[in-house]
Each structure stands twice: as structure tokens, then as C-alpha cells.
């Protein structure tokens, strides 16, 4: 059993985690204060029925944000090494930006960026 050390580490860390969680539950301050019962920054009431559906617009805007955030993370290394890249590297990035621009134009035309619909 060559992984005995890892097994012992997992058992010790699991036991310690359970002990700390239990101590926090037993010794923790349980009286709600004004910050705990107030409405969050997003405007949702913490004691409201959690079964209320979210608008699909929230998810659409979130997905669009992720797509364009990833675009920036892909473009940063290219921008750092731009002068050392051959012409092929330039055209690959231009194709990438063109495809993303087409996607943005499509979303714009379909009304995905308008909140009022």
C-alpha cells in the first residue's frame, strides 16, 4: 500500500474539517442582526421563496460576459508576443476576432443585448 501517507492525510484533514465545522456550529453566534436579514446588493430578499424563476436574460448576459472575458484572456498572450509572431499568427488572431465579431453582431440583431424585450 504505497499511498498510505495520502490516505492518512485525507483522514486527518477530513476529521479536522468536521471538528472545525462542528465547533463553528455549536459556538457560533446565532442571533440575526440587521446585515444578515437585509436585502442583498443584487436586490433579492434572502427570506423570499427560492422557487421564483430567474429571467433568461440573466443567464444570457452571463454567458456573453464569459465569452468575451475569455476572448480577452486569449488575446493578452498574443498582444504580449505580437512583434515576435509570424504573419500566420496575425491572421489566426484576425480570424478569431472576426468570428467573435460575427457572434456579437448576431446577438445584437437578434435582440439578445436588449433588456426591454
Swiss-Prot record:
Keyword check for Electron transport: yes
Example GO molecular function: NADH dehydrogenase (ubiquinone) activity
Reaction equation(s) it catalyzes: a ubiquinone + NADH + 5 H(+)(in) = a ubiquinol + NAD(+) + 4 H(+)(out)
Pfam families (alphabetical): Oxidored_q4
EC nos: 7.1.1.2
A GO CC term assigned to this protein in UniProt: mitochondrial membrane
Intracellular or extracellular location(s): Mitochondrion membrane
Chief localisation class: mitochondrion
Bilayer topology term: Multi-pass membrane protein
InterPro entries in the record: NADH_UbQ/plastoQ_OxRdtase_su3, NDAH_ubi_oxred_su3_sf
Role: Core subunit of the mitochondrial membrane respiratory chain NADH dehydrogenase (Complex I) that is believed to belong to the minimal assembly required for catalysis. Complex I functions in the transfer of electrons from NADH to the respiratory chain. The immediate electron acceptor for the enzyme is believed to be ubiquinone.
Family as reported in the entry's similarity comment: Belongs to the complex I subunit 3 family.
Protein name: NADH-ubiquinone oxidoreductase chain 3
Organism this protein belongs to: Sarcophyton glaucum (Toadstool umbrella leather coral)
Gene name linked to the record: ND3
Amino acid at each position: 500500500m504505497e499511498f498510505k501517507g495520502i490516505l492518512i492525510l485525507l483522514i486527518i484533514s477530513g476529521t479536522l474539517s468536521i471538528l472545525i465545522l462542528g465547533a463553528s456550529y455549536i459556538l457560533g453566534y446565532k442571533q440575526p442582526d440587521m446585515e444578515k436579514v437585509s436585502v442583498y446588493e443584487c436586490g433579492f430578499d434572502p427570506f423570499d421563496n427560492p422557487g421564483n424563476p430567474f429571467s433568461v436574460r440573466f443567464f444570457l448576459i452571463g454567458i456573453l460576459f464569459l465569452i468575451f472575458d475569455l476572448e480577452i484572456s486569449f488575446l493578452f498572450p498574443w498582444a504580449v508576443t505580437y512583434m515576435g509572431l509570424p504573419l500566420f499568427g496575425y491572421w489566426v488572431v484576425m480570424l478569431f476576432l472576426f468570428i467573435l465579431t460575427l457572434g456579437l453582431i448576431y446577438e445584437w440583431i437578434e435582440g439578445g443585448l436588449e433588456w426591454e424585450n
